Amino acid sequence: MEQTVLVPPGPDSFNFFTRESLAAIERRIAEEKAKNPKPDKKDDDENGPKPNSDLEAGKNLPFIYGDIPPEMVSEPLEDLDPYYINKKTFIVLNKGKAIFRFSATSALYILTPFNPLRKIAIKILVHSLFSMLIMCTILTNCVFMTMSNPPDWTKNVEYTFTGIYTFESLIKIIARGFCLEDFTFLRDPWNWLDFTVITFAYVTEFVDLGNVSALRTFRVLRALKTISVIPGLKTIVGALIQSVKKLSDVMILTVFCLSVFALIGLQLFMGNLRNKCVQWPPTNASLEEHSIEKNITMDYNGTLVNETVFEFDWKSYIQDSRYHYFLEGVLDALLCGNSSDAGQCPEGYMCVKAGRNPNYGYTSFDTFSWAFLSLFRLMTQDFWENLYQLTLRAAGKTYMIFFVLVIFLGSFYLINLILAVVAMAYEEQNQATLEEAEQKEAEFQQMLEQLKKQQEAAQQAAATTASEHSREPSAAGRLSDSSSEASKLSSKSAKERRNRRKKRKQKEQSGGEEKDDDEFHKSESEDSIRRKGFRFSIEGNRLTYEKRYSSPHQSLLSIRGSLFSPRRNSRTSLFSFRGRAKDVGSENDFADDEHSTFEDNESRRDSLFVPRRHGERRNSNLSQTSRSSRMLAVFPANGKMHSTVDCNGVVSLVGGPSVPTSPVGQLLPEVIIDKPATDDNGTTTETEMRKRRSSSFHVSMDFLEDPSQRQRAMSIASILTNTVEELEESRQKCPPCWYKFSNIFLIWDCSPYWLKVKHIVNLVVMDPFVDLAITICIVLNTLFMAMEHYPMTEHFNHVLTVGNLVFTGIFTAEMFLKIIAMDPYYYFQEGWNIFDGFIVTLSLVELGLANVEGLSVLRSFRLLRVFKLAKSWPTLNMLIKIIGNSVGALGNLTLVLAIIVFIFAVVGMQLFGKSYKDCVCKIATDCKLPRWHMNDFFHSFLIVFRVLCGEWIETMWDCMEVAGQAMCLTVFMMVMVIGNLVVLNLFLALLLSSFSADNLAATDDDNEMNNLQIAVDRMHKGIAYVKRKIYEFIQQSFVKKQKILDEIKPLDDLNNRKDNCISNHTTEIGKDLDCLKDVNGTTSGIGTGSSVEKYIIDESDYMSFINNPSLTVTVPIAVGESDFENLNTEDFSSESDLEESKEKLNESSSSSEGSTVDIGAPAEEQPVIEPEETLEPEACFTEGCVQRFKCCQISVEEGRGKQWWNLRRTCFRIVEHNWFETFIVFMILLSSGALAFEDIYIDQRKTIKTMLEYADKVFTYIFILEMLLKWVAYGYQTYFTNAWCWLDFLIVDVSLVSLTANALGYSELGAIKSLRTLRALRPLRALSRFEGMRVVVNALLGAIPSIMNVLLVCLIFWLIFSIMGVNLFAGKFYHCVNTTTGDIFEISEVNNHSDCLKLIERNETARWKNVKVNFDNVGFGYLSLLQVATFKGWMDIMYAAVDSRNVELQPKYEESLYMYLYFVIFIIFGSFFTLNLFIGVIIDNFNQQKKKFGGQDIFMTEEQKKYYNAMKKLGSKKPQKPIPRPGNKFQGMVFDFVTRQVFDISIMILICLNMVTMMVETDDQSDYVTSILSRINLVFIVLFTGECVLKLISLRHYYFTIGWNIFDFVVVILSIVGMFLAELIEKYFVSPTLFRVIRLARIGRILRLIKGAKGIRTLLFALMMSLPALFNIGLLLFLVMFIYAIFGMSNFAYVKREVGIDDMFNFETFGNSMICLFQITTSAGWDGLLAPILNSKPPDCDPNKVNPGSSVKGDCGNPSVGIFFFVSYIIISFLVVVNMYIAVILENFSVATEESAEPLSEDDFEMFYEVWEKFDPDATQFMEFEKLSQFAAALEPPLNLPQPNKLQLIAMDLPMVSGDRIHCLDILFAFTKRVLGESGEMDALRIQMEERFMASNPSKVSYQPITTTLKRKQEEVSAVIIQRAYRRHLLKRTVKQASFTYNKNKLKGGANLLVKEDMLIDRINENSITEKTDLTMSTAACPPSYDRVTKPIVEKHEQEGKDEKAKGK
């Protein structure tokens, strides 16, 4: 580490960059070159030094370097980074300490670094004003660009701008050089942007290029320069670019899916959208214009006559739009279709294909490109209801299926995949920055340590001489490090630290070592490293606001606050050292919370920090605070005693000498949990301080009696005081004079009388009841504001005004009293108080300006009072925090978004503005600019904003009509993809990430909450007291009632004892042990006095044990990890006590950490109670009933009781039988189905009606019977404790009541009718019967509390906008309409209400009416906001708002244009934030639920989980028998040809080509094209048939064993049949070309063969994995739709047909209702369906209209029912169910990506088996050893082993069975081990795979391996050695013999013998060689004994196998 700091950091580390420095660098470079002449590039990159990331150009200088000497600012200095030691660079630092790095070579070949010109340029460049100037220029330039038609003088301004930019570039080029070296001008990509902008400016100026406006738009790119100037933006842009890269796979998949769907659409709907209703041609001859003149010369009775005949021209007639049928107010003619379920034409019209397509001809499926556009529109769900309605009208309702598929698979899946990918890219980016930061931190820490050690050593030498303190300095040293180090943490960094902590926790759990022991963890924000002044922040809840304390001396607390940060299970607080030694409880989670500054236990034994007992695990909060606060409470700081205040309330824990209980005799702390007697801003009141001082200080003094203790304490104290003083100085933000000023003027404590007054006021204002009262006032005030409406009576208005004055008074009084009680200085130290002050001031200002016109907006500031609720409402607090947190992170993103919006708005204005003006008549009938145009900047901005909201198609049609298709498509698509899909998804990703579970931890313990809770507690206590008194009174007056007395006694007792406990805050253990009761009143710890102290709990938690956040005893982290370990079993007197306390702990621990629920666990936490599978029914009644009414107790042993019991048992058996259940399910389905028939035609179908009536009775009787049976069988107790049974019960009741009413003849009563509609709930009973749905519903029920919570918060949030809307728009939406034409009168004709009334008096056609959805009261305001937030129907509301003038005035076109901004702001906060918050909460909640269910997917049943797991690991495949190669030579050749990969791929290419030819088809193609296409198609059919035939020849009957082949076969047959019978099929079925589209499915197969397609495979795999869960959610959605459809039919069947309700889309029949509801599932078009239902009285509708064929009168709707119906449906389907869908996809996507990231994927295993099949054709699962080498080489990477691989294979030590065979699993394991390396996971995988393999292959004979390859090799080698030895021995013997013979026959032919001997030796050698080769080749080289053992076994198995085969045949 020391090496990275080249120079010791500090001010002396800077040196001027001089010629000598340059020479030195050159010398070093030369030396290096001499050392290695050819540097190895690669090597260098890998292992060489890296540039120090802290010293990068553009970053600020780390503050470890101290201040820069002023003479060195803006001067060239030597580079500080050791990496650049031999590179020609130097750095320059400006005043802000920013680092600029320059190349030391000559710029432009002439300017050396020492050239005065270059020096000046550098000075200018690094000056902060320079970038400011550029920034201002850019902004001014942007303002000029927004001018739509700029005046002439702006030309000169343009030149000025160009000049400034040129100047900037020149300065940069002179200072940096142009492009050759590093750090020159063009090396920075952002400068390329400048360069191009400037070049274009000059080019357009001097060269005439024709279309200048297009080029002028390039100037817009200058806005992008802001990005390069603002540092934070670059990172966000980086993230954006990353996510776009990541999106490539999704984009490919999306385009592919859309193409497939577009092809299907093309085939299905080609030309359909041109079907129009055309008038029947009249018979008279007046239609001359449509007739063709023909001159006919004919022979008439022999005389030639010339006659002119008129013939009718059909074609031109049908094209004439005058004869088409138009609905009023619609631009396009009415569509129709010729199929029975399509739209019909009115009388006198016929359906003909004529004219152009709808929407200027842009909406159609006529060619592939238009179809693709339509599908893209469907996918982004923009105005798709229109496309849906048009298509269904033209083609028929059955085609709804097509839309269902596209919406669910295309839209939901693909769009959310984009979200998932963007979110993951963001997450990765985050991870990277976190890791980098962590690394930096470690380095930085080491530097600090070094510096500090020196300083400390010096200090310590002076301070103490005693050897006994040798250990302290290090501790103190660390403390002071922290003091100078802990910069203020931003909330973001706190979050980052939390994330890091999580990561580290995971690492440690997975067996990490304690390597980051005393690593000091600190915020990552770059600037925090370089802050000069350090301030400590108490990091209480996730948000870090600073708190100041009641006296300047309390800085101690601030150390405590940050050092011992009170976060729960804080893994690393700001500052954490782990006791490195033999830490007793080191395996626990809080090991590094030991803030002990002592290194090992021995030293802790008698230290100030009282060590804890072995294995005792405390809640982390306790462990931290106990230690820390004891350390601080022991010595008075500056003579005053202060207890520690942390944000969890005040915990003052003091060590006292308690009885040594543990064998070791360690001291145990006594723990007292004090209630936070703190006022709002955390200051401790005087009285409390006094009390606490007296109560706790003496204990610690006793503790310190021991001299050694005292001495040690004092030494620590001194060191701490030093630290503290340093801290104090460093914490002060302002110059000291300000502190003096504030001490004198802002702290009022001069006169003692005043102090008394202050004290009294303090007691009053700080009382919890006052808080409660204020909260109630806030709620009341909000109600008062929400009561405003239009029209209001004078009196009501007066009441509201007075109310407002009263509330303003109350809040003002509160503020002033608080200021008196707290002093202004401390009052304004707290966020909430500043907020209060701000609001009060505004209210007072508003009262003053009440009568000023146009300032009514100030009234809306009152609404901010609502936010005061956040103090006492955790969820709201959390929401505001999340918005706060994300605004930080989103700030940059919002800027980027703003820049993008700006750029596109300007581009649009420049490119299309003129066209809108010129061609306006094309898009507007009156030739006036429409509302949405691009002629000026504001409107252009609105269009871009609208596109971001997802509405692009309508504005794009207009644009395409006026400005040409290509340009408009390009611009709009870019905005859509860049802005909407990427940036907005990044927005969502950020929101979701700030939503991570820890943020939701039911808001962190906030002392603010306590006040309310204390107040509520007191009320509870008061009530309990009154009850007790009443009981006592009763007891005295009626002595007889002894029983009551007995019941009350324990309660009474408990209360008395509690009072004792309360009175004495410092509970001494001996005396008050009996106070220690847990909530049930059982004493929990009399046994030993050991861990009792922890449970001394005071007042309020008796009542609110769980929901009192100030009590930090009970916050285990999750249900799975409660504090059982805390409770040492010996502490409990009995088993039962232990159990009980465990239960208590469990209850408290599930105080639902991660959810937004505040109290208790979610309702449906327990799985649904199923009746036990015993055949004995349970008791009928509850215990209570039996005790009260003795008659319920029946003996079942004899007589009637026995008969009754037998009856119950019989019933129980019946009910438990599967058939019974099946029958009931069948009945439920039938009765639900029956409801679907009750549509408007039921009265005309008499027989069906009668049948239904009888059926209804039958069903009711059956269900009643079922209910009775269950009552008898299960007993009331079981029946009525099951939620599902209650559901059944209520639904049966409804049927029963309506049945009785019918029998009594009351069926026409209104109440009974509405009850009948409740029968629609019948299908709900199916829920409990279908497991799949029940699972989803349980998950949903679990989420309901948090969903409701968020819903409430959203409502509060929206309330503010709603009240504001009422303030702005109430009564202003009224307008005067001409009832005949429906047009609004001009202002010139009608100016106000009275004018309109005059018109009405004169003639009847005018009417003064309101917009249906308006802001006249808060309720309607909510409805309007919902329409705006879902972007449906928002246009009408916005138009009305923008046109409004004032109450009772006629609106004028775009009168108050800037009202658009109200909606823009609402959309950003109300829609983007709150609706996405919904998604966040739901996803978060399901993850919570998932954890609870043990990480399993909660949307799946057991069966589906099995499927899911099978999908997850396909590794369970066994080697299959390949299709045997046919013996016939010709067949064999074909077989080889067909089975090659090339053949497959070529077929795929053919399929794609076939698709292309299908894409070429259009609706209006000529006959010539049609014939060519049909021929091409014929060729394809021949080719595919050929493929089919070839495969049939080669694969024989095996062809049909493969699914894909059957699929191909069917398609081919269909194509052939289709070719011959095309006409017939066209007529009766869908067009046969569709079957060709299905072939595309085969492309899925090819993905496996393409290496690059891995990403796409992952995406498809994620889809496959999501299917089971998505199916369940789909089922639930269907059920909801079904119920709502039936409800809709019974309520809205006869509504007037207008707006969205017409002859096809209505609630008249079940089918139509379903079609409507499907469309609303995505919230599309619900405003249109709601509008007619809001008609409640004439003249909007006619209540007496007769509906033919029905007894119902009138066509009015029921507004309240309608609003409830639609709003509830949207919340259920759109917000909840659809978001569940998203949650599943996100989840599975992350799982799938994790899977694909593993080194070995399923595909690799599959490839292994595919290759295996070739080597093991009989699927024996074994392979001979000699084949193995080839096999290993044949595999594909990563498993393959290229030859030569014999040695590697031998080294793998593979087990072999007889016959030298190796099992496939063993090989697979060995190979995977090679890829993954040795690890524990490997063994787990092995076991898993073996189990799976055994399961899938019961046939695997468990051959015992006899040997292994390694053993075999060793045996072979040994054999060779033995043989050699033996041969040598032989040889020796022979030689001996030979020599003996030789000696004998010495004289006879000696020479001859020598030759013989040579030959002999040669022969022996030869022999051994052949044997050697033999050995390696031989396979039977194992000793005979082995063979003998295994042969019979093997033979036996082989024989068995043959027998089995024979049997099989």
From Swiss-Prot:
Chain intervals for the UniProt region annotation (Disordered): 28-60, 455-528, 584-627, 1129-1163, 1984-2009
Disulfide bonds: C277-C345, C336-C351, C921-C927, C959-C968, C1376-C1396, C1741-C1756
GO biological process, one term: cardiac muscle cell action potential involved in contraction
A Gene Ontology term for the protein's cellular component: nuclear body
Record region (S1-S2 loop of repeat IV): 1561-1571
PTM sites of type Phosphoserine: S470, S523, S525, S550, S551, S607, S730, S1516
Membrane topology: Multi-pass membrane protein
Keywords assigned by UniProt, alphabetized: Cell membrane, Disulfide bond, Glycoprotein, Ion channel, Ion transport, Membrane, Phosphoprotein, Repeat, Sodium, Sodium channel, Sodium transport, Transmembrane, Transmembrane helix, Transport, Voltage-gated channel
Domains as described in the record: The S3b-S4 and S1-S2 loops of repeat IV are targeted by H.maculata toxins Hm1a and Hm1b, leading to inhibit fast inactivation of Nav1.1/SCN1A. Selectivity for H.maculata toxins Hm1a and Hm1b depends on S1-S2 loops of repeat IV. The sequence contains 4 internal repeats, each with 5 hydrophobic segments (S1, S2, S3, S5, S6) and one positively charged segment (S4). Segments S4 are probably the voltage-sensors and are characterized by a series of positively charged amino acids at every third position.
Name this protein carries in UniProt: Sodium channel protein type 1 subunit alpha
Annotated organism of origin: Mus musculus (Mouse)
Gene that specifies this protein: Scn1a
